[in-house]
């Protein structure tokens, strides 16, 4: 949205290429339905141009671009095409249903690309630029031309090609840093000099397309805008060839947060950024790194005691944007070995606890001991520490022994001995697999209606003797309880983790009873 301080000349077009360049990332292939879902989300969040695919590459890509073109409500739908006429014609057919369509055609212009990839002379490339843009312009008024590997192209030849492309009808000129070779000052100067040198540069919008091979894709993108570009080509989560592309969420928030140095604006609804990140991550099966800027799990998480103390007093001490701005519910104070008393007290208050000073000291000592042993300390862990302090007891359900018989034939069988509040119980159960047999055994020994929400196993270290760490999450009466356990035997770790979560439910229920909640037994 524009304001009195914003003008159209300061607007930056956001060109998302998640469905094209992003999907070219090895292993990031999306299904037809996933592409439609991502495109719908991009359209809803205010992306100006969606590069929906490369129609000539396959029938599947063509169909996806064609269907997205039919469904788009707000965005320009763009298809990529090589300089060959058959590619351009196929691209034009794919985007035809779009209310606003664009053909994006490209050709390499650097000496190394012309010699080894195209095996063409500069004069031939120049003529092909004119021919391809002219062909594309016969299909649509919105044509983008890219000088592939522009940052390694001889400047005079680059300017000649740009002038010819604009004269042939290109409305957007893209100067990609195809191999992530440029540095910000160099890239800014490239755009400034090109716009000064090319006589008809005012007839087209200039675009940046930066790869992250040296980790400077976002910085280069913003430098290009400072040099006069007014379109940024980017992807959700920065996915793309090799080290990826400039991340949409990062360039958008850089402009929002640093208006003092980056006085540009865009149409992106930033509260959808986290949702967009999760959607693309799910579609591509590419996890988002925890410390990823803007949308990473730790982007608004604080563990250091000093930082937590500052955040409790004033969030601006350690956050330059509010989490709600990007669609995150709030700041997370992550409890761990670096956390201090202030952070623990704040977390306990969030969980509804009010303890005396002596009780807090006791919980804090045991919390620090736990944090030294565990990588992450969750709300449920803190609840368990407090429950132990308030209940003056240990877990009521303890594993005494476990034997599992498994093989290639017949159902698997588990025999388990538990100490349930001082009473020894032994039971045998079958299951569809050894883990199922173990959990069925627990259900037989301790009847309950908690539902299994998560079962996850990973090796703590490498090698065949590695400990298995198992995470189990149980839901009961709208509340989830998570527990982890490690053991060289995966099945023993599984049993311990399940019982750990079940013990937390029991402790939670007992605390509710003390607070005059209805006394409903979880375990019999």
Swiss-Prot record:
Keywords: Amino-acid biosynthesis, Branched-chain amino acid biosynthesis, Cytoplasm, Leucine biosynthesis, Manganese, Metal-binding, Transferase. It catalyses: 3-methyl-2-oxobutanoate + acetyl-CoA + H2O = (2S)-2-isopropylmalate + CoA + H(+). It comes from Rhodopseudomonas palustris (strain ATCC BAA-98 / CGA009). The keyword Manganese applies. Pathway: Amino-acid biosynthesis; L-leucine biosynthesis; L-leucine from 3-methyl-2-oxobutanoate: step 1/4. The keyword Signal does not apply. Its cofactor is Mn(2+). This is 2-isopropylmalate synthase. Its main location: cytoplasm. GO terms for biological process: L-leucine biosynthetic process. It is found in: Cytoplasm. GO terms for molecular function: 2-isopropylmalate synthase activity; acetyl-CoA C-acetyltransferase activity; manganese ion binding. Mn(2+) binds at residues 21, 209, 211, 245.
């Amino acid at each position: 949205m524009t304001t009195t301080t914003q003008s159209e000349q300061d607007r930056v077009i956001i060109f998302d290429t998640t469905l094209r360049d992003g999907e070219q990332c090895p292993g990031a292939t999306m299904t037809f339905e996933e592409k439609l879902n991502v495109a719908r989300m991009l359209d809803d969040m205010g992306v100006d141009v969606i590069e929906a695919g490369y129609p000539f590459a396959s029938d599947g890509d063509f169909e996806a671009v064609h269907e997205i073109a039919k469904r788009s409500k707000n965005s320009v739908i763009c298809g990529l095409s090589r300089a060959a006429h058959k590619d351009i014609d196929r691209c034009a057919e794919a985007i035809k249903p779009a209310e606003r369509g664009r053909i994006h055609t490209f050709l390499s212009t650097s000496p190394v690309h012309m010699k080894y990839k195209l095996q063409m002379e500069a004069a031939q490339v120049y003529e092909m630029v004119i021919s391809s843009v002219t062909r594309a312009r016969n299909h649509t008024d919105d044509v983008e031309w890219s000088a592939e590997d522009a940052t390694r192209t001889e400047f005079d030849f680059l300017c000649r090609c740009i002038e010819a492309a604009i004269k042939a009808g290109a409305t957007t000129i893209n100067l990609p840093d195809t191999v992530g070779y440029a540095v910000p000052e160099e890239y800014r100067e490239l755009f400034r000099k090109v716009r000064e040198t090319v006589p008809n540069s005012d007839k087209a919008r200039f675009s940046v397309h930066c790869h992250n091979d040296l980790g400077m894709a976002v910085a280069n993108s913003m430098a290009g805008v400072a040099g006069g570009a007014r379109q940024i080509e980017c992807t959700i989560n920065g996915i793309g060839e090799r080290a990826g592309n400039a991340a949409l969420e990062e360039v958008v928030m850089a402009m929002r947060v640093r208006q003092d140095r980056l006085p540009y604006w865009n149409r992106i609804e930033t509260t959808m950024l986290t949702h967009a990140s999760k959607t693309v991550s799910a579609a591509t099966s590419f996890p988002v790194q925890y410390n990823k800027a803007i949308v990473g799990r730790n982007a608004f998480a604080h563990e250091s005691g000093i930082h937590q103390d500052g955040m409790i007093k004033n969030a601006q001490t350690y956050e330059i944007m509010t989490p709600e701005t990007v669609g995150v519910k709030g700041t997370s104070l992550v409890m761990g070995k670096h956390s201090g008393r202030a952070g623990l007290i704040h977390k306990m208050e969030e969980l509804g606890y009010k303890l005396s000073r002596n009780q807090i000291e006791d919980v804090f000592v045991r919390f620090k001991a736990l944090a030294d042993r565990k990588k992450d300390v969750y709300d449920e862990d803190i609840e368990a520490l407090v429950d132990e302090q308030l209940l003056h007891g240990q877990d009521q359900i303890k594993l005494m022994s476990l034997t599992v018989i498994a093989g290639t034939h017949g159902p698997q069988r588990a025999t388990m001995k538990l100490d349930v509040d001082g009473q020894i119980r032994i039971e045998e159960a079958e299951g569809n697999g050894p883990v199922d047999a173990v959990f069925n055994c627990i259900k037989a020994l301790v009847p309950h209606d908690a539902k299994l929400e998560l079962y996850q196993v990973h090796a703590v270290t490498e090698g065949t003797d590695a400990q298995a760490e198992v995470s189990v999450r149980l839901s009961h009466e709208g509340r989830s309880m998570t527990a982890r356990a490690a053991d060289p035997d995966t099945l023993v770790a599984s049993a311990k983790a399940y019982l750990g979560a079940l013990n937390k439910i029991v402790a939670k229920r007992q605390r509710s009873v003390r607070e005059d909640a209805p006394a409903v037994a979880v375990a019999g």
